[in-house]
Amino acid sequence: MNELLKSCVNGRTLNEIEAHSIMRDMMTGSLSAAEIGGLLSVLAYRGETAEEITGFVRAMREQAHTIDGPEHVVDTCGTGGDGSSTFNISTAAAIIASSAGAKIAKHGNRSVSSKSGSADVLEYLGVSIQTSPEETIKSIERRNMGFLYAPSYHSSMKHVAGARKDLAFRTVFNLLGPLSNPMKAKRQVIGVYSIEKAKLMARALEAFEPEHVLFVSSRDGLDELSITSPTDVIELKGGKTYEYTVEPGDVGLPLGRLRDIQVATPEESGRLIVDILKNRGPDSAVHIAAFNAGAALYVAEQAADLKEGVALALEAVAGGEALNQLERLKQKEEELYA
């Protein structure tokens, strides 16, 4: 058995160099499925440290196929695994925010621990998910949004896919994915299923010099800014860290209902997103999408604060820009400029 793995089993935490080493071994196929499963189980049981996450992220970024995107590009993504069965809120938020001026590099995958992953729902909506890096950059430059399909950029993840699936519970990879955007986005809105994990991720991300990042974790368990409860926020901006709580009323939104934002399939999620973009979905669904889109607009410097961002997002939905953006994203490049 790997010596570092043995030390983890015996209760010791890893320093950043050791964490980097063992993640590199995982990413290069040097560990067996049993060893990977053992490590992920130990970490899930005892909890990860910020230093371990920093080392893991550094190794994942080194193994990834990275690309350079436009300045101020924003990623909206979450850890998933909150078990709430909500529609793909961060995906809807990305479409709305990009229609209102933010440049979005949406990093995502098919579902691992939820009803529907961002790739699943975008595919249902008719948006191409497996574009080349060049096509993705062009889409962001011309349409303000591109999708970075995780397996295309993190091919080394194939070595851990089997173990993750077999374990069927949240692992450290739920935390690492949002910190490993292939476009090295320095601006992000990251939804996290618990504020404790958000604090860990924020401390780890500080090592990578972020420009403006919001970690959001709602008290009803969503890895989103919520319209059904207060949301705890950790904001990294200009080398400083701010912690605060935001409620729907703070940004001009009423409290909503969880059942109005829950779905059972990617198809149901897709249909609800279309209804939201048409401004005819349940108020709770429109509002939670706008709340999270507003956060992306704030991080993208398109809004002075969250409240202004939400107002701009609601305007984009009401004015039809968000629905038009979906149609643009569905078009092939040659159709768009024919």
Curated annotation (Swiss-Prot):
GO terms for cellular component: cytosol. Pathway: Amino-acid biosynthesis; L-tryptophan biosynthesis; L-tryptophan from chorismate: step 2/5. Anthranilate 1 binds at residues 78, 109. Its EC number is 2.4.2.18. Anthranilate 2 binds at residue 164. GO terms for molecular function: anthranilate phosphoribosyltransferase activity; magnesium ion binding. Binds 2 magnesium ions per monomer. Mg(2+) 1 binds at residues 90, 224. Keywords: Amino-acid biosynthesis, Aromatic amino acid biosynthesis, Glycosyltransferase, Magnesium, Metal-binding, Transferase, Tryptophan biosynthesis. InterPro entries: Anthranilate_Pribosyl_Tfrase (IPR005940), Glycosyl_Trfase_fam3 (IPR000312), Glycosyl_Trfase_fam3_N_dom (IPR017459), Glycosyl_Trfase_fam3_N_dom_sf (IPR036320), Nuc_phospho_transferase (IPR035902). GO terms for biological process: L-tryptophan biosynthetic process. Its cofactor is Mg(2+). It is an enzyme of class 2 (transferase). Mg(2+) 2 binds at residues 223-224. It comes from the Bacteria. The keyword Glycosyltransferase applies. It catalyses: N-(5-phospho-beta-D-ribosyl)anthranilate + diphosphate = 5-phospho-alpha-D-ribose 1-diphosphate + anthranilate. 5-phospho-alpha-D-ribose 1-diphosphate binds at residues 78, 81-82, 86, 88-91, 106-114, 118. It holds the Pfam family Glycos_transf_3. Catalyzes the transfer of the phosphoribosyl group of 5-phosphorylribose-1-pyrophosphate (PRPP) to anthranilate to yield N-(5'-phosphoribosyl)-anthranilate (PRA). Homodimer. Belongs to the anthranilate phosphoribosyltransferase family. This is Anthranilate phosphoribosyltransferase. The lineage of its organism: Bacteria, Bacillati, Bacillota, Bacilli, Bacillales.
